[in-house]
Amino acid sequence: MQLHRRDQHPLGILKNAIYEYFDTNYSDKFNKFDDLCPLVSVKQNFDDVLVPEDHVSRSYNDTYYVDPQTVLRCHTSAHQAELLKNGNTHFLVTGDVYRRDSIDSTHYPVFHQMEGFRVFVPDEWEASGMDGTSFAAADLKKCLEGLACHLFGAVEMRWVDTYFPFTNPSFELEIYFKEKWMEVFGCGVTEQEILKRNGKPNNVAWAFGLGLERLAMVLFDIPDIRLFWSNDERFTSQFSKGQLGVKFKPFSKFPPCYKDISFWINESFTENNLCEVVIGIAGDLAEEVQLIDNFTNKKGMTSHCYRIAYRSMERSLTDDEINDLQWKVREQVQSKLEVVIR
């Protein structure tokens, strides 16, 4: 559906607002890419950005593998190497990314990211009297502090040191918004090995990433991530091109329906796989999957009880409809996950 390419959609509005910031503040225009194929190789998704072989994100429980060598990209960083090799030095990449995850109001198996990347030549940092890493880090922080002000207005900010495989040093920018601290950007100075591999051994660079839904939910007061996928005119008609931060007005609040499922788990069971089964059957009607009880008996067998919340954004669900979905969930959970229903 490429929601980020729709100028009147909250994600498209946010993307264009970020474009506006970079176009206004940088004479060296950033090349923009928002239509790159989400099918990438394992090498592109992990190896090219130095993700360790034993990193949890490589797991079949966390990533959508099409085959052993191909995945649906987990992040827009998967295109970093190819863009560098093609001669790009300033670029923004926006696209849909895919991760196996929990089910709740802020998580969805597909969401949207934007990555920014900027390369510097030695003359730039040598003229400043700083070393390359310090120069890139200072420029990065100035850039993202300006972007945060552009999107959120005058807000209190703080920098937090963190870890990413592909940057060193690595940071997160947090803003104080609506009476709490919120992480808005993950970023850092690009690992030199990435630049060396892509024909830029004498350069330094910075990179940042952001989740469009995460920011748009706050800016537009959108309470549930599933709403971004709604074609209901009561949702889509509330937003206009160029109108950043228009507050969403809930058009209805249909009641949820709760169903519990209990089963004995095996050693290979993961909650992400359970959520994948539920989404595969209920789709957007699955609002949340929550572990509400677990215990281990005297024989060492462990039982989990999950509560599934079903709710439509657009209509009331019938008891027969929910009972049918729950029956299918029970069947598929038992057959696909090889657990024993209680």
Predicted regions and their residues:
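A carboxyl-terminal module marker
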Residues: V160-R342
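Beta-rich nucleic-acid/ligand-interaction surfaces
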Residues: K32-R58, G153-K178, D293-K299
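Short histidine-centered catalytic/ligand-binding loop motif
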Residues: Q2-D7, E115-A137, K259-E267, T318
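Amphipathic alpha-helical segments
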Residues: I13-Y26, A137-F152, N273-G280
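Long mid-to-C-terminal scaffolding/interaction modules that assemble large complexes
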Residues: F91, P109, Q113-M114, R118-E124, ...
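Conserved short secondary-structure elements within globular domains
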Residues: T89-R99, F152-M157, E287-I292
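Prokaryote-biased recognition of long, low-complexity C-terminal linker/tail segments
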Residues: E53-V66, H75-Y98, D104, P109, ...
